[in-house]
Amino acid sequence: MNNTDIKLVSVVIPVYNEEASLPALLSRVTAACDQLSQNYEVILIDDGSHDGSTELIRDAAAVEGSKLVGVLLNRNYGQHAAIMAGFETAKGDLVITLDADLQNPPEEIPRLVEAAMQGYDVVGTMRRNRQDSWFRKTASKLINKSVQKATGVHMSDYGCMLRAYRRHIIDAMLCCQERSTFIPILANSFARRTIELEVGHAERAHGESKYGLMHLINLMYDLVTCMTTTPLRLLSIVGSVVAGIGFTFSILLILMRLILGADWAADGVFTLFAILFTFVGVQLLGMGLLGEYIGRMYTDVRARPRYFIHQIVRSATTPSQQEAEQ
């Protein structure tokens, strides 16, 4: 493949309360993209920020000749919905996603473009020497392993959003109408050729991570339930095993009662309660899992928009318009 296959590179960056990081982010992203032989645009999606991020994005995108495009959502929809809004706006033949916290270095962008030019549909990344806390690294490993088993999609680092997607992959994802979406897995389901690159990782310089404990738990549910029905099959298997154990144990209790008498049976009351609570716990877990699937079906049936773009801010002449004129 040659340079003519990628004429325009779009860098999509979701932003939520990143006022302190934005000046350095814009400077470093622009410097990295200036090294490309292709034209480029940088799309900043404001996901309902409450600080000064919205004004910074609006001002930067409105500058004459700026290659920045500001996409302002009317409220907070979440990281992946914001990225999908960026995909809808992006015009590039290659689209790169990047977090706004600068933990993944923008200087890696040329490497992703170079890898995509070798014919890969998706260029993923995995973080080298992660600078996160022990809790976040451990939780991330558990989620990665669980999702790999449940979905069958083998990726080393689901949490690293520094990735590159070819135009046809973006178009395929935009055709999907489900409300709960995890972009890396969804993209891989359409890709023929994928590759993963090691990239650097830095500590968060400003603010705090938007992914706390509950966000990580919700993310795991999203990953598993929005892409596969494996947990439902697993639940059926677990239910069958528990039912078999319960039946066997019931027969055993009857035999022990006949052999050892009523006194032995009375002494085993706490054992019965423990077993009962175990079965009830399994049932509640199964009901909760079914509720997750039913809730997602209800959300999809309502067919409400995943996001609403309040305003798009761009200069009079953007790189995508220049490409159209050529």
From Swiss-Prot:
EC code(s) of this entry: 2.4.2.53
Keyword entries, A-Z: Antibiotic resistance, Cell inner membrane, Cell membrane, Glycosyltransferase, Lipid A biosynthesis, Lipid biosynthesis, Lipid metabolism, Lipopolysaccharide biosynthesis, Membrane, Transferase, Transmembrane, Transmembrane helix
Any one Gene Ontology BP term: lipid A biosynthetic process
Main location: membrane
Membrane topology note: Multi-pass membrane protein
Catalytic activity, reaction form: UDP-4-deoxy-4-formamido-beta-L-arabinose + di-trans,octa-cis-undecaprenyl phosphate = 4-deoxy-4-formamido-alpha-L-arabinopyranosyl di-trans,octa-cis-undecaprenyl phosphate + UDP
Transmembrane spans: 234-254, 269-289
GO MF terms held by the record: phosphotransferase activity, for other substituted phosphate groups; undecaprenyl-phosphate 4-deoxy-4-formamido-L-arabinose transferase activity
Pathway entry: Glycolipid biosynthesis; 4-amino-4-deoxy-alpha-L-arabinose undecaprenyl phosphate biosynthesis; 4-amino-4-deoxy-alpha-L-arabinose undecaprenyl phosphate from UDP-4-deoxy-4-formamido-beta-L-arabinose and undecaprenyl phosphate: step 1/2; Bacterial outer membrane biogenesis; lipopolysaccharide biosynthesis
One cellular component term from this protein's GO annotations in UniProt: plasma membrane
Alphabetized InterPro entries for the sequence: ArnC_tfrase (IPR022857), Glyco_trans_2-like (IPR001173), Glycosyltransferase_2 (IPR050256), Nucleotide-diphossugar_trans (IPR029044)
Superkingdom of origin: Bacteria
Pfam families: Glycos_transf_2
Cell compartments where the protein resides: Cell inner membrane
HAMAP family with a match to the protein in the record: ArnC_transfer
Function: Catalyzes the transfer of 4-deoxy-4-formamido-L-arabinose from UDP to undecaprenyl phosphate. The modified arabinose is attached to lipid A and is required for resistance to polymyxin and cationic antimicrobial peptides.
Family per similarity comment: Belongs to the glycosyltransferase 2 family.
PANTHER family in UniProt: UNDECAPRENYL-PHOSPHATE 4-DEOXY-4-FORMAMIDO-L-ARABINOSE TRANSFERASE, UNDECAPRENYL-PHOSPHATE 4-DEOXY-4-FORMAMIDO-L-ARABINOSE TRANSFERASE-RELATED
Protein name according to UniProt: Undecaprenyl-phosphate 4-deoxy-4-formamido-L-arabinose transferase
Gene (name only): arnC
